[in-house]
């Protein structure tokens, strides 16, 4: 399953942009 983004490099687009901070 995908990680949950706590910080993304594109706001609101965690699924199509890279996470800068993730938790599983």
From Swiss-Prot:
Q: Where does Cd(2+) 1 bind?
A: 3, 22
Q: Which sequence ranges form a coiled-coil region, renumbered to this chain? A: none
Which amino acids does the record list as binding Cd(2+) 3? 5, 19
Q: Does the keyword Disulfide bond apply?
A: yes
What is its induction? By cadmium.
- Which domain of life, per UniProt? Eukaryota
Q: Which residues bind Cd(2+) 5?
A: 8, 17
What does its PTM field state?
Contains 4 disulfide bonds.
Task: Specify which residues bind Cd(2+) 2 according to the UniProt entry for this protein.
Answer: 5, 22
Please state which protein family the record places this protein in: Belongs to the metallothionein superfamily. Type 8 family.
Protein name listed in UniProt: Metallothionein
Q: What are the top taxonomic ranks of the organism? A: Eukaryota, Fungi, Dikarya, Ascomycota, Pezizomycotina
């Amino acid at each position: 399953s995908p990680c949950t983004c706590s910080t993304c490099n594109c706001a609101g687009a965690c699924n199509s942009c890279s996470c800068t901070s993730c938790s599983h």
